Design a protein with these regions (language model features):
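Sequence-level preference for short, compositionally simple segments enriched
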Residues: 109, 113-484
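Ser/Thr-rich, Pro/Gly/Ala-heavy low-complexity intrinsically disordered linkers and tails
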Residues: 23-112
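Sec-dependent bacterial lipoprotein signal peptides
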Residues: 1-21
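Generic alpha-helix initiation/capping and coil-helix boundary signal
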Residues: 7-14, 29, 173, 329, ...
Length: 484
């Protein structure tokens, strides 16, 4: 990218003054926050597979004096605590660390922790499980539709798939991934198409257009590193006017690829699934003077599943978009591996990384450090990025306490005055992210893991001149956590 659930009902005079100031100017990238200085290349398997059963924190009774612990269990963070008895009264259904109790106030109540490192309470966390996070989609203006989508089983057992098409450099039904996808689109219909990709390296840019039928793209090997789709476009790379960048984001009038156009793989079709693959953007950003954003995977569709998929890059590795700011589109990443250094998990989509390894690369940023997540969630959407049951690891040689968990990407905003104007209008980004029940390595900053936004909106977990940031944690462990 480029270098709340709480809403304000009225704006302070200072904010109104900013709003009246207005401002102009284009975002440095067509689709990402302006990053810290950058440079780099691209690898491993998650330690804890999604779906492994982890015990939730004890639930808490809901009566004023109810603090009795309930039993808690979870699989993907969705088990509920069994209402514990309060000290003299009955608890109202305690929530496990990843569970749904009978009550709860979302993020309307007070968090725990510190102002700089807020922690969700058990009741608040109950509203932010995998299934709660993904249960709704649609248009914010007309009201989201609850379809209770449950993708936690993943893409399925590849041993039971019968391929419609096969891709192999030595010759299957197709020699490139894109040609097989094109064939699936041309065939039409609504039945799922299975495309098996043989082990090997495929150097190409791939687009799954919105017109595609449901597609499952997979390799048979559980070693995702054996099947690699890679390319090296980046934001500032020049291109001829009239030439398409990524076909899913053609940017024909542009003279550079732009962030969205840099994507190695773009998935724009609903119900797309991928399993046992590596998708990489291997731009050497250290050799690039500007426009370093280089996306590996970009999505802009609903009900997407990526299982055992490795995503390699540096800045802007994983970009989850929506067709527009008012649309909620969902994606689920199970047992994945994502690496990068600046804003490398970002976008305004609603998505979950479950049982993943998220690895920070230090070679390019050095002592400067970087940011892991950069959500640009619409302020009306309570669910942006959820990282759960995952491991945040780090490349050897990274100093302790160097890296931020993230920052809000104020997408489409040029500066604080522009942001203030957007807030006054009621349509504005306020990135939402929760990292919970995960293990944080020593590279994470202990006291202040959340940075100011991409337009320098100061981080604050309470509303003031600007809306409160929506960046929280819950029940994390490890040397980089709030309770190491």
């Amino acid at each position: 990218m480029n270098s709340k659930s709480r809403r304000i009902l009225s704006l302070p005079l200072a904010l109104l003054a900013l709003a009246l100031a207005g401002c102009g100017g284009d975002d440095a990238s067509d689709g990402g926050p302006a990053g810290a200085s950058s440079s780099g290349g691209g690898s491993a398997a998650p330690d804890a597979p999604s779906g492994s059963t982890t015990g939730g924190d004890p639930g808490f009774g809901g009566s004023p004096s109810g603090e009795g612990a309930g039993t808690a269990s979870s699989s993907t963070g969705d088990g509920s605590g069994a209402g514990g008895a309060g000290a003299g009264g009955s608890g109202a259904g305690g929530a496990g660390a990843g569970g749904s109790g009978t009550g709860g106030s979302g993020l309307d109540g007070s968090t725990t922790g510190t102002e700089a490192r807020p922690q969700l309470t058990g009741a608040q966390a109950a509203h932010h499980t995998v299934l709660k996070h993904l249960e709704k989609a649609g248009e914010l203006a007309s009201g989201l539709v609850t379809d209770s989508w449950d993708p936690t089983a993943g893409a399925g057992d590849v041993g039971g798939f019968t391929p419609t098409y096969t891709v192999a450099a030595s010759g299957g039904t197709h020699r490139t991934v894109q040609s097989a996808i094109d064939a699936a689109v041309a065939s039409g219909g609504a039945r799922r198409v299975y495309i098996e990709v043989a082990s090997g390296a495929y150097r190409e840019v791939v687009c799954v257009p919105s017109s595609a039928p449901p597609i499952t793209l997979y390799s048979k090997s559980a070693d995702a590193s054996r099947t690699v789709i890679a390319y090296n476009n980046h934001n500032g790379k020049t291109k001829e006017t009239g030439k398409a960048a990524n076909p899913c984001n053609a940017n024909l009038s542009g003279t550079t690829y732009g962030t969205s156009g840099s994507a190695t793989f773009a998935a724009y079709a609903d119900d797309f699934q991928a399993k046992n693959l590596t998708i990489a953007n291997d731009t050497d950003e250290r050799a690039v003077s500007g426009g370093k954003q280089a996306v590996a995977l970009m999505t802009q569709a609903d009900r997407l599943i990526f299982e055992n998929v490795r995503l390699l890059g540096n800045q802007d590795t994983l970009y989850v978009k929506t067709p527009n700011a008012g649309t909620v589109s969902r994606a689920y990443f199970k047992g994945c591996y994502v690496e990068g250094d600046v804003d490398f998990i970002f976008g305004r989509g609603t998505f979950v990384l479950d049982g993943c390894t998220i690895r920070y690369l230090t070679a390019r940023q050095g002592a400067t450090g970087g940011y892991i997540v950069a959500p640009s969630t619409d302020a009306r959407n309570d669910h942006g990025i959820l990282i759960i049951n995952s491991d945040l690891t780090v490349e050897a040689g990274t100093p302790d306490g160097l890296v931020y968990l993230g920052r809000a990407w104020d997408e489409g905003q040029n500066d604080l005055a522009t942001y203030a104007t957007s807030v006054a209008s009621g349509a504005y980004p306020n990135g939402q992210a929760i990292i919970r029940n995960s293990t944080l390595g020593p590279h994470i900053r202990a006291l202040d893991p959340w940075h100011a936004s991409t337009v320098s909106r100061p981080y604050s977990s309470t509303a003031g001149t600007y809306p409160a940031n929506r960046l929280h944690e819950h029940a994390n462990t490890g040397p980089g956590s709030a309770r190491p």
